[in-house]
Amino acid sequence: MSNFIHQQSAHCESGVMSSLLTHHGLPMSEPMAFGLSAALSFALIPFVKLSGLPLIAYRMPPRAIVKGLQKSTGVTMQFQTFRDASRGMDALDAMLDQGRVVGLQTSVFWLPYFPEGMRFHFNAHNLIVYGREGDDYLISDPVFETPMRCDRASLMKARFAKGALAAKGLMYFPEKIPSDIDYAKHIPLAIRRNIKIMTKAPLPFIGIRGIRRMGQQLLKLERDAAQREHYLPLYLGHIVRMQEEIGTGGAGFRFIYAAFLRESSKLLDSAKLKEAATAMTEAGDHWRLFALRASKMCKG
């Protein structure tokens, strides 16, 4: 078994990468992992439906943090997927027998340590496996305060669940890690990449244009008496559910990015980044206030 130290975090993928890199000798906070990967985003995707309503996302797609950190830090990650579930579990066992710590992409629905009310069919939940005892795998799930255990059958189901974003048993781990990071170079580059994502995306439902588009839709629904009574509460409830219940949410990701800007302001001695961190925190506050007021409207 490795000497891995569990860390709770705000979001699964950024938390996993923070823990993996720190464990392998490159200390990195979760906000820094999130910020360097340029993962902040917004998307209102009309052609992907959940219960007849458009998919809303507040960050870049799954695996974007893992891949983004490779670009920003020089870390080389090894990725493995499997057609056969048994072979995928055997490969995991072989890594653990070598004392390796690995990240997995899983389905929340099949993880038995999740309370029943928190389980849903979401196939992009990231966690770390750092050992095993008998039939149990020792899990560092970033969203939990303490390490967890998961039996082999359940973990196999979680890794090989079918459907959207199916992981196909995805297992990943660092192969090459630099001794340090040139923050003065990579922080500004990552911020510029994120600005481009939010302000210059070619599609009208991505970034700031996507946020405005959603706002315009809400105003249009509010002006239509029939839609205001029936569809608007459903849409508001959907937005809040996507924002606050599924994953870290709109406000949560803004708070993480604000923490990245604050940490960066200290590393680079930048008053502008400190000011930007305050503005981003305020943006998160507004998203949370919106969710609160929308919830009250849904309840009447």
Model-derived features with residue positions:
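Conserved active-site-adjacent core of cysteine acyl-enzyme catalytic domains
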Residues: M1-M28, A38-S179
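Short, charged/polar micro-motifs that form catalytic or ligand-binding hotspots
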Residues: H6-Q7, R119, V240-G247
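Short helix-capping/linker segments at secondary-structure and domain boundaries
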Residues: T22-P31, L261-L268
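Residues that form generic nucleotide/phosphate-binding pockets
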Residues: H23, S72, M95, A158, ...
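Noncatalytic regulatory segments and standalone regulatory/sensor domains
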Residues: G134-I246
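Charged, long alpha-helical assembly modules
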Residues: R241-G300
